[in-house]
Amino acid sequence: MDYLEKLQSLMENHPSDFFSLWEEYCFNDVVKGDELVVLLEKIKGSTIAPAFGKIAESVIPLWEQLPEGEEKDKVLSLVFDVQTTNSKNLLEIALQQVKKYEDSANYKEALRIVGLRDGITFSHCLGRFALLMHLSEGNFVFHQGGWGVGEIMGVSFLQQKVLVEFEGVLTAKDISFETAFRMLVPLRKDHFLARRFGDPDAFEAFARKEPVAAIECLLKDLGPKNAKEIRNELVELVIPEEDWSRWWQSAKIKMKKDARILAPASSKDPYVFDPKGFSFVSQLQASLSGSNDANKKITSCYAFVRDLGSELKDESNRQLVIKELKALDLPADSALLIQRAMLLSEFLGEKAPELECENIAKLSEDQLFDIVNNIEILSLQKSFLALIHSCSPVWVPVYTKLFLTTSTSMLREQVFKVLNADKEARENILKKVFAMIEQPLLCPELFVWLFARVVDGEDGLFAESDKKEIERQMLASALELMHKVATTSQKDLGKKLYSFLVGQRFLVVRQIIDQASIEYLKEFVLLSSKCPQFTQGDLGVLRSLAEVVQPALKRGTPEEEENILWTTSDSFTRMKNKLQSLVGKEMVENAKEIEDARALGDLRENSEYKIALERRARLQEEIHVLSEEINRAKILTKDAVFTDSVGVGCKVVLESDQGDKVCYTILGPWDANPDEKILSLKSKLAQEMVGKAVGETVLFQGKKHKIKEISSIWD
């Protein structure tokens, strides 16, 4: 344990031991500025600060040994923050330190404000003096109370106030010097926060052009940050949300070659900036020495040779990597052995007998499959697959097995491309694919991947004449798969299929079921109804799509169609409110009317009582009818409206033989308004139009009208 750790440990728990060790520390031959800064900042916020303030002057000999620079100034400023003696020696040092500001117009006034003019009490004087000298129009400060970065708009040494416009406050704020000493931290004009607040457009342009320099600026001024924290500092404030992923990926690639930014071992660890720079080779050595895991060592070497190929121009660096790789004790015929061989061969120019064709040809199908499956570096995995294809007589079964089992999309793409190019392998794959279409649970991930490729026309497996039928088979299997995986660990595949099918207003479904037979569509509707991923609205749309293709489906279910009461959201809310009023208000009032009428006596001749009873009967009937209608109601949504033929939710333009045009909107009975030319779906004219397309004829008021245009009420 070094001095810093020991002193920090004793600070709170053993103060007396701390001061004894501090005396010893003061005689140290080697003085580290960064260590002193950390120690003094800890003391400043600790319970021993008052006691240490009496001996703070003991830091001065250590301070004098430090080289000139920001670190030395920081140490001295901290000494004056904790000192309580206000000695003559400290006063002279302070006056000498602030002499660099003597040309400032407010120099003498600042001396008075911080206590250096009379020299009686001057605690915190250097930090406060530096802040006062920084308080000029156009400079920036940071508010430690949550107001964020601010730009100085004006200063009055007479009133001892500063006017600051903060990013987190709507109006500029007048702040007294006394408050400023406690809350404000001066920022350089090139500080990350100052640049982000002062000229965000210029800083965004800079960050786009020089992403690594922008991140260096952030880490230098704000300290180490992990990826999430970097995102929080930059997204929207510098880089727009929609551009962030692309910008960050580009920045990460470039940062790998920046010697001044140390990349983290994991996503939770921070990026660290060091102006002196880090040695890439020393980073590699530290990574290798810090682990006994051969897999991690191979991964570290791969990252080094992949990202920092220029470092290998130095022969000593190349030999270092070769030595580290060859020193690994690896089992024969293992994925690790093959990965090492490929690194030595492809990146380091070393011969690797394990990769010779005759040796690969000796490996069995199971051995090759296990090796490929256990190679964790994708590019090496793909390279070894290419070797298997070139050298092994059993490459087809290895590729086929991998195609059926891998969950890596890029690997599946490569394997599929090679298999599809070979006639014999292609026939074998087709047999497997047809079996999978029949039973998608055999290879569910592969089925979902292949379904998307077939629909997009990127499979290359099936003849164009067979494609439509294959798509329909796969759609039916997809619905079956969605039903079966809904409550299993593979439910995400069901969600993926759902998103694929409902995207772009069910475009995939519409393309596949176009011109399908009525038998297929009946099965399609039935399978859809079993999928819990579909909402009731989705199921209504799917049924409507099927009915558009085969109108006979409508005629087959007249009762079901008749039972739906289409309504807009506003009308549905209005009717629900009406029902609540009938039940909760009018029925209660009617009950009181009946009770009052009873009190009049002689119910046989009591007309008030009879009227009240009749009103109750009417109310009960109205409540019954309205309740039944609400139960049948279905809110009309954008996805439920189709304009290839007239239906609910459509606006229809009719043209008479004389050229007169009239536009009708078709909605449910609750929304009907003849004055506004809004027809109920159940009206005679609407029923005459429903199911007809543009160009067809409608008989209206004894005259023929042609349908000129069909649009959605949302268009």
From Swiss-Prot:
SUPFAM superfamilies cross-referenced by the UniProt entry: FKBP-like, GreA transcript cleavage protein, N-terminal domain
- A GO term (biological process) for this protein? DNA-templated transcription elongation
Q: Which domain of life is it from?
A: Bacteria
Domain GRAD1 residue range list: 1-502
One molecular function GO term is:
RNA polymerase binding
Q: Which UniProt keywords apply?
A: Coiled coil, DNA-binding, Transcription, Transcription regulation
Report which residue ranges the record marks as coiled coil. Answer: 603-640
Q: Which Pfam families match?
A: GreA_GreB, GreA_GreB_N
Family the entry assigns: Belongs to the GreA/GreB family.
Summarizing the function annotation, the protein's role is: Necessary for efficient RNA polymerase transcription elongation past template-encoded arresting sites. The arresting sites in DNA have the property of trapping a certain fraction of elongating RNA polymerases that pass through, resulting in locked ternary complexes. Cleavage of the nascent transcript by cleavage factors such as GreA or GreB allows the resumption of elongation from the new 3'terminus. GreA releases sequences of 2 to 3 nucleotides.
Q: What is this protein called?
A: Transcription elongation factor GreA
Q: Which organism is it from?
A: Chlamydia trachomatis serovar D (strain ATCC VR-885 / DSM 19411 / UW-3/Cx)
Give the classification, highest ranks: Bacteria, Pseudomonadati, Chlamydiota, Chlamydiia, Chlamydiales
